[in-house]
Curated annotation (Swiss-Prot):
It is found in: Cytoplasm. GO terms for molecular function: ATP binding; tetrahydrofolylpolyglutamate synthase activity; UDP-N-acetylmuramoylalanine-D-glutamate ligase activity. SUPFAM superfamilies: MurCD N-terminal domain, MurD-like peptide ligases, catalytic domain, MurD-like peptide ligases, peptide-binding domain. Keywords: ATP-binding, Cell cycle, Cell division, Cell shape, Cell wall biogenesis/degradation, Cytoplasm, Ligase, Nucleotide-binding, Peptidoglycan synthesis. HAMAP family: MurD (MF_00639). Pfam families: AlaDh_PNT_C (PF01262), Mur_ligase_C (PF02875), Mur_ligase_M (PF08245), MurD-like_N (PF21799). It catalyses: UDP-N-acetyl-alpha-D-muramoyl-L-alanine + D-glutamate + ATP = UDP-N-acetyl-alpha-D-muramoyl-L-alanyl-D-glutamate + ADP + phosphate + H(+). ATP binds at G118, T119, N120, G121, K122, T123, T124. It is an enzyme of class 6 (ligase). Cell wall formation. Catalyzes the addition of glutamate to the nucleotide precursor UDP-N-acetylmuramoyl-L-alanine (UMA). This is UDP-N-acetylmuramoylalanine--D-glutamate ligase. It comes from Ligilactobacillus salivarius (strain UCC118) (Lactobacillus salivarius). One of its GO terms (cellular component) is cytoplasm.
Length: 458
């Protein structure tokens, strides 16, 4: 860790008491800043608040007093807090610099950074990259950080110059970077998402592309080549472009040909040997292969990871098999593209559990994926009726409306047959009923476990 002096004696306001906010506050205090943390909510568990206060950090909860902006030099913002927030907009009006926590991580670390962004596939790709970089490694370590759960500023304090920090970065986080400079940037894909936060699709794309804004010709930009828009976006980076393509549209990086995974001229392994299901996971694997090859990893290291890695929690996660029905938790599928790709990964008939927050979309786009594959749907949440309409148009035989992803489980089992896949892949955010997609997925798994126990008792 570099003990930089730029924050010594500065007044910093950390907005938001989440993991990243707490770690940023502690780090800034260590760097000599005068730190105040503010959150509009007062947490029921005061453990973190007391920890911060014990380190000499002022904590103010319950509201956003405007006087907190007086004489501050910097705001470190929780990425989920919108720029329309009264303190954030006030800071902008005053010309106060606003950053997010990954920026701090970059500033204090000598490690190499790999930044991964995109609409879908970020977490799985980030995890695959770290596993490949660590496979067979005798010197240096790859850390996973960022939007995946471990704050980058926490990891950055441990990592050395021999290490690599593989950081999953959301569009929200990328809006708050100014100097963050990844040796390798990865763009998995870009679809329409978070328009409620960014206002327009163009703003969303621009936020994502901030990941390359500080790259030079000595860096690498790994980009999905299967879409013309994404190809064009690669021109925004000064770095060396390394494409990956499931459709074989470029052979200059990682791609699929004849049922095999390749890197340039190098045949690595059969596509069918990837353990995690789904065409989307083929794309994730290709992105990870490209990064692994940039860092000189062997085919054997790559094969070991792809043939053993069973997936990330809430991303087409296998839960259990119950009387010939396989249950999968894909709660992370918060948009239609993610659900389309999840469905494409299964050959067996599917009972689909879907629905959630209404963001103003209709679901006609899902209909081709539902046809001839989904024989039953259990729909729930604010979009239940819209989801049911798409199912009806696609010719789905049975459509049942229920309260949520928990009550959907026994209903799904009732309409399923031996050999079916029962898939939670909502195509919607969880916020109408659950605080996060992780909570939704965990509740789904608990409901499956409860159903298993009930059936065993009969």
């Amino acid at each position: 860790m570099k003990m930089i002096e730029k924050y010594r004696g500065k007044k910093v306001l950390v907005l938001g008491l989440g993991k990243s906010g707490v770690n940023a506050a502690k780090l800034l205090k260590k760097l000599g800043a005068e730190v105040t943390v503010n959150d509009k909510n007062t947490p029921s568990d005061l453990t973190q608040v007391n920890e911060l206060k014990n380190e000499g950090i002022e904590v103010i909860t319950g509201s956003h007093p405007l006087e907190l902006l007086e004489n501050i030099d910097l705001m470190v913002k929780n990425p989920g807090i919108p720029y329309t927030n009264v303190l954030v907009s006030g800071a902008k009006d005053k010309g106060i610099k606003i950053i997010t926590e990954p920026e701090l991580a970059f500033e204090i670390s000598d490690a190499r950074f790999v930044g991964v962004t995109g609409t879908n596939g970020k977490t799985t790709t980030t995890t695959m990259i770290s596993l490949m970089l660590n496979q067979g490694q005798t010197e240096g370590k790859a850390y996973v950080a960022g939007n995946i759960g471990v704050p980058a500023s926490q990891v950055a304090q441990e990592a050395t110059s021999k290490d690599t920090i593989v950081t999953e970065l959301s569009s929200f986080q990328l809006l708050g970077i100014t100097e963050y400079h990844p040796k390798v940037a990865v763009l998995t894909n870009i679809y329409e998402a978070h328009i409620d936060y960014h206002g327009t699709r163009e703003n969303y794309v621009n936020a994502k592309m901030r990941i390359v804004m500080n790259q030079t010709e000595d860096d690498y930009f790994v980009v999905n080549w299967d879409n013309e828009e994404w190809q064009e976006l690669s021109q925004r980076s000064k770095a060396k472009i390394v494409p990956f393509s499931r459709l074989g549209k470029s052979k200059d990086g990682a791609y699929v040909a004849g049922g095999y995974l390749f890197y340039k001229e190098d045949k690595i392994m059969p596509v069918d040997n990837i353990k995690v299901p789904g065409t989307h996971n083929v794309e994730n694997a290709l992105a990870a292969i490209a990064v692994a090859k940039i860092f000189g990893k062997s085919n054997e290291d790559i094969k070991e990871v792809l043939t053993t890695f069973s997936g990330v929690r809430h991303r087409t996660q296998y839960v259990t098999t119950l009387n010939g029905r396989k249950f999968y938790n894909d709660s992370k599928a918060t948009n239609m593209e993610a659900t389309e790709k999840a469905l494409a990964g299964f050959n067996n008939p599917v009972v689909l559990l879907a629905g959630g927050l209404d963001r103003g979309f209709t679901f006609e786009k899902l209909e081709p994926s539902l046809k001839n594959k989904v024989h039953a749907m259990i729909v729930f949440g604010e979009t239940a009726d819209l989801m049911a309409k798409a199912g009806k148009e696609a010719g789905v035989e049975k459509i049942i409306k229920t309260k949520d992803a928990v009550s959907a489980v026994p209903e799904a089992y009732k309409v399923s047959n031996e050999g079916d896949v029962i898939l939670l892949s909502p195509a919607c955010a969880s916020w109408d009923q659950w605080p996060t997609f992780e909570v939704r997925g965990d509740k789904f798994i608990e409901a499956v476990e409860k159903l298993t126990e009930e059936l065993e008792e009969k």
